[in-house]
Amino acid sequence: MCEPSGSDDAMVHASEMVDGDEMIHGNEMVVHDSVMIDGNEMVQENVMVHGSGEMVQGSEMVHNNEIIQVNDMIQVNEMVNGDKMAHGHELVGVELTTPTASRRRRKKSVVWEHFTIEEMPGGVSRASCNLCKQTFAYSCGSKISGTSHLKRHITLASCPMLKNEDMKLSLPLATVTNNDGEGCAERVAKRHYRSTGYANAMFDQDRTCSNLAKMIILHDYPLHIVEQRGFTAFIGSLQPRFRVIDVDTIEGQVHSVYQKERENLMHVFSTVPGRISLTVRLWATSQTLGYISLAAQFIDTEWRVHRRMVNFMMVSSPHSENSLSEAISTSLSDWNMKDKLFTITLDNDPSSHDIYSANMINYLSNKKDNIMIKGQLFVVRCYAHILNTVAQDVIASVHSVIYHIRESIKFIKASSVHEDKFAEIALQLEIPSAKTLCLDVTTQWNTTYLMLLAALDYQQVFASLETCDGDYNEAPSTEDWKKVEAACSYLSLLYDSAHNIMAAPNPTSNIFFHEAWKLQSELSNAIAHEDPIFRSTAKIMHERFDKYWKDCNLVLAIAVVMDPRFKMKLVEFSYSKIHSVEAAKYVKVVDDAIHELYSEYATQGEANRDAHVTDNSAAVTPPNGDELLDFDIYLSEIATSQPSISELEQYLEEALMPRIQDFEILEWWKLNTIKFPTLSKMARDVLAIPMSMVSSGSSIFSATATGSQMLDDYRSSLRPETVEALFCAKDWLQYPPATTEAPSTALVKMEN
C-alpha cells in the first residue's frame, strides 16, 4: 500500500461522491468529531476508521496489520460505490472487523463546529477556537469541563474575530444536547447550519420593534412597558444589541402594524361577494367622552362566516342617535362599503330602539345608501342582550330572598362544624338532591340561577337548621321559597336558550328564531298562570321580551325561512301557537316581506345581466345563415307565453330537508348556488346577520358580555387614534394576512 503524503492535519479534498455518500467541498478540514465519510470512514480525535476497522487511540490505525499515520493528506478525486481511488497513489479497501467494545462516543454539541480539541502534555485536552485560536479547558483525565463556556465564547461574541457585526453567529440553542452521547453504527451526516427562521438570522432592530408592538397589541400591555426597568433588563439579557426605544417610538410601531393590517382587511372586503352587516357597541369612559366599536360580519365566497372589527371611534355623545349615525356613515365611507350595508345590530335599551332605527334609516337614506325593503330589517337588537336584561329583571324581583340565601350559604361554609351539621340534617330528612351549595358571582346571572336551584332542594334543611342552631337566623320563609321556585322556573327558560345558542357550532341567524319563538310562547301562556307569584314573575319577563319579539320577529322569521329544513312551515306553526286565530295575518307579513326582499335581489341581478349582455352583444350575435335562429325565436316565444316560477317559489314548494343533527346550512347553500343563483345571494346576506353581539364560543351570561362597556383610565388617556389602532389591530392579528380562511364548521372568533 502506497504511503500518502503527510500534513499536519488529515484533509480530504473531494470532487465527487457517488451512491448517496457525502460530498465535502473544497479543502474542508476534518479536525473534529462526529464526521462520517463514505458511510464507513470516520475521523474522530485523530483516530481514523476504514470500513469496520479497529479504532486505536492516538493517531494510528491498524489496517490489515499495517500501521498508518493519520495525519496525512489524501487527495480524492472520485469515490464510487464505497471504493476509493487516491490521486497519484493506490488505496485498496480491505474489509476489517471491529470489536464493539472499542467503539467511542461521538460528540453532538454544535460548538465543535467552532472548536478543535488539542491534546496537551499530561493527558490534558484543551478546546481551541478555530477563529481566534484561544484555548479553553476541556478535560483533565476523566474529568470533562463541558461546553457551556465554549458556547458563550461564540454566542456572546467574546471571540475577537466575531466583533465585526457581519460575522456574528447565533447558535441554534434549541438543538444543544449533552456534551457526550452514545455512538451508533448507522451513517451520520455531517452537521450543517440550517436556518429555522430566527436561530441563525442576523439581528434586525426594526423587525424586533415590530414584533414588540404586536406583543403589546395582542396582550394589552401598556405602551410604557418599553421604559420599565425590569422589561429593559430582561430584553438586554436576551439580546444585548437591542436598542431600547421610548414610548413615542413604540406608539409609532403600533400605528404601522395597524396600517399594514388595515390594508390586508381592505383587500378582504374587496372580495366579499355579498353585503356586510355591522354590529355597534358602546363604550363609556370616566370622562364625558365615549367610544363606539364597529364590527363587520359577512359570508365569503366559500360560504364561511367572518366578523372583523373595523373601527373604534371616539364620539362626543355616544348615546345620541345622531352621533351613532354619523359615526357609521363615516366608517362606511372609509371602508368603501356604503353600497354594501345590509343590517345594523345594536345592544341598546329597547325603549330607544325605535328612535335609533328611525334616525339611522333617515340619516343613511339621505346619504343614498342602498337599504333593502325600506329598512324593515335594517336595525336588529342583540338577542344575548335581551336574555341578560330579562334575567336581571327576574333576579331583581327576588333580591331580598337571594340575600338570605347568600347569607345562609356563607354561614354553612364558614366552618366544617356547620357543614357537617347541615349534611347530617339532610341525611336525616332523606333529601335526594346531590347538588352542592355554592355562592354565586353577582355579575353572572347563570351562577345566581344555579345557586337558587341548589338551595331550593334544601329548603327543609335550612328550616331545620334554624330551629336547632341559635346562631343561624337567615332561613327564607315559605313564601320566599315560592318566589325562588317561580324565579327558577322561568330563569331555566333563559338559561337553556342561552346554552343552545352558545352550543351551536355555527351560529348563523337562522338558529335564533327557534329560541325566540319558544320563549315568546312560554311567556305568553305564563302570564295567565293560576298562581299569582308565578303570574307576577312571568308578567315582568313578558313585558320586556314581548317588545323584543315585536321589533325583531320579522328578521328572525326571514332567517329561518332560509333554512331548507323549515322554510315557511315553522313560521306558520310557531305563529299559530303564539297568535292563535290571528296567526294568518302575521304569517302574511312574513310572506310579503320575503317576496319583496327576493324581488329586490332579482331586480339587481337582472340589471347586472342586462349590462353584461350589452357589453358582450357583439360576441353573441349569431352568424348569417344560422339554421337555429328561428328555433331560438320559438323558444323565446314559449318562455314569454308561459308563466315562469321564481327561484323563491320553487324553493318554498320543494320538500323540506331532513332535520339531521349535523346539518350544515351554509354547505347546503354552497352546493345549491347554481340551482338558486339569485336566492342564494339573498340567503348569503340574511344568514350573515349578527343576531347576537357575543362572540362565538364566549359566555353570554356575564354583565359585561352585552351592553355598554367601560374603557379603563389608561386607555382613556391615550390619543383616540392610538386607542383605535390597539383595539382593531388586536382583532386583525388573529387572522392570516389578506385572507378570510377559517374553519367551515365554526364561526371564527368574533370581536369581544
Swiss-Prot record:
Residue ranges crossing the lipid bilayer per the database entry: none
InterPro entries: hAT-like_transposase_RNase-H (IPR025525), HATC_C_dom (IPR008906), RNaseH-like_sf (IPR012337), Znf_BED (IPR003656), ZnF_BED_domain_contain (IPR052035), Znf_C2H2_sf (IPR036236)
One of the record's GO cellular component terms: nucleus
Start and end residues, zinc fingers (BED-type): 106-166
Residues annotated to bind Zn(2+): 129, 132, 153, 159
Superkingdom: Eukaryota
GO MF, one example: DNA binding
Main location: nucleus
Subcellular location as annotated: Nucleus
Presence of keyword Transcription: yes
Coiled-coil stretches noted in the UniProt entry, renumbered to this chain: none
Region (HATC (Hobo-Ac-Tam3) domain) location: 647-733
GO biological process per UniProt: post-embryonic development
UniProtKB keywords: DNA-binding, Metal-binding, Nucleus, Transcription, Transcription regulation, Zinc, Zinc-finger
Function noted in UniProt: Transposase-like protein that is essential for plant growth and development. May regulate global gene expression by recruiting other cellular factors.
Record text on subunit structure and interactions: Homodimer.
Name the UniProt record assigns to this protein: Zinc finger BED domain-containing protein RICESLEEPER 3
Organism listed in the record: Oryza sativa subsp. japonica (Rice)
